[in-house]
């Protein structure tokens, strides 16, 4: 460039920045200034940098992704083979790959990132950043083996550069991928390796605490994935202590902690998001342990925190947290007999999914929404709708646990509909698919429970006792309170059916105590019906009347809630089977067409064996 060209270049850059930072920003003039630079036929480095700047501006301030893509592709083509041009070259590759991802063209993103990784081996920061990005791209496409391989390359590269903090991040990220792949033994081995490094080799106390939160989140999720609710308690307590340390007022800001040197600028999640995540795993634990009140309390706190963060900056991950929390709280509502809140929250979850960019969340969570609608329909005794929803969930999902969960509830639906061949087919399929897999203790205990329930309905009482004792053994080992209460009340009904009133009373008493603690209205409804019959057999009229009054109270609450549900517009969601769900709807008080609501409600209140749904 000549000196006059140089002066024009600097002036145009200054003007572009002035327009960008004006209040409000004048992006059109900013872009015009940058485009004017090309009239001076600048050197390759200047041309490449300008194309990158235009791509950045267009992505940040406009919806013109095609023009942004064009500029970034130009910047990548120009900078790819220029030496000593790392920031522009690799920033371009990273941003271009990100744009391809947004356009759902990951097949274009991967070769760009692979080439950039190959060119960045001399630069630890960019090499690791690009490895993480490519691993994330493969993970998003469910290519977990490739993602794991890239993270293993990251571990090796940090060994060469002695970047211990980065090595811990690569190890923990790889453990997370292994969890998705259900490689339990590999997860434990990698977590143990990472834990040793965090404890002994990380000197910076602030970085150490962040890594501990990441480590304990994974450890807690690993135990919960295996249904080990009791085993996880120590790790969960340590996680809660670590997050309290990070959230303390005297703790430095993320900017201070992660800005010291290039190999320590990587952060898994900012502390405000970690705070929500810890609430989320605590909710998951409370739900599995059968503490619905606790789960509700922590969910409300987490959702409040999410709304606060959204008002500051609406990051996409906040919607992910919100949808998972809603999925948990909906199951809590159904257990507690509050279907009217559950269907409202299912509709809210649906709206959150629809509002996400490119309906990304809907693609990920459509099976879960169908499963929740199946549970809602099932709890309302709308078995035809429940069947269709569970079947859709099973067809759509690729997650083994969700498929097993939906199949077990579908089995109960077939049991209630007296469809023995379909029930048998599901039980055989579950047995076959899960005989060689390490499954969640909670889900496998539920499988034995469903078999016990089936045996009870066939009056095979000895077989029912055998299955239910197996369920109780698994449930008691890990404090799975809801599974315990369901098994006890069914076992009590088994003993009542064979005339053993003493054993029946011994089972139903702790079942009712647990059910009131959870609280689980369906077990309480069932248990109060058993108690009424037991006290009549034992000629205890006062206690029989008390049990009858309790049963009537539970029944009336369920009937009232059921009648309320059928008047909600959201109730029509049970008819959504394929495609996108209906857009956000206004609540109406008009009653639904279809089955008379009173008849449906009465079926719910009947308290028949197996009415309660299974939840993880």
UniProtKB/Swiss-Prot annotation:
One of its GO terms (biological process) is maintenance of mitotic sister chromatid cohesion. Keywords: Cell cycle, Cell division, Chromosome partition, Mitosis, Nucleus, Repeat, TPR repeat. TPR repeats lie at residues 90-123, 445-478, 485-518. It is found in: Nucleus, Nucleoplasm. The keyword rRNA-binding does not apply. InterPro entries: MAU2, TPR-like_helical_dom_sf. Pfam families: Cohesin_load. Component of the cohesin loading complex. Required for association of the cohesin complex with chromatin during interphase. Plays a role in sister chromatid cohesion and normal progression through prometaphase. This is MAU2 chromatid cohesion factor homolog.
